[in-house]
Amino acid sequence: MVVFDASVGAHRGGPQRIPGARPFDLDGRLSDHDAPAPHTMPTAAAFEEVLRGLGVGDGDAVVVYDAAGIYSSARAWWMLRVMGFDRVAVLDGGLPAWTAAGLPVEDGPAVYDGPRGTFTARPRPGLLVDADAVAAALADPAAVVLDARTRERFAGSAPEPRPGLRGGHMPGALNLPFGELVGPGGLMRPAGELRAAFEALAGERERLYFSCGSGVTACVLALGATLAGYGETAVYDGSWSEWGMPSDRPVVVGG
């Protein structure tokens, strides 16, 4: 089994790790830094090269976690699925749940210096989408676009953390802050509660598109939707970091 630490931001390279964890560096090599939006998915060839360098084989089982709980680990899980790899699971509650259970940790950041793996990227079209696909979904009565940002950012009453972005949301998008899918102890809520949270906004619509600030917490919604039994889901890779740039793409301010 391969265990990945997918922590980002202040938690990246933290002081403790699950024993044997390897770095899934979303702030580093596992994002395309030539793209205008942060955390953009790298090319299939680049992703494959990094995963091989981390010793992952096509037959391995993978578990991803992060030090914040349920946060960036969902992005790592979704990226692996986008690249055709399904033998991957998210550690519920992440490192906080692991340590709360009294399980062992090692000091220092996640590292890997072992042999290369044989991972093969097999990209799946449709799981990760661009702005044009989201615009089409907003006009499709059979689809719904859900925004994982806070209610204040969605309404435009709180500033965006990334300079230069407009406040507000896409016309027709609905707000489901990702934290509302997380229950006591930092664990994902039960499947029935997750389904109810999605149905409260989507109704009978089964085709769900997810957005957030930079494509990370949108994947928490994707994880929740998968646990709730939804099969037609997609993540907007650029998310608000792209849509919110000064452009002619429409923005709504307010609830």
Question: In which residue ranges do the predicted regions lie?
Answer:
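Cytosolic catalytic domains that perform sulfur/thiol-centered chemistry
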Residues: M1-G255
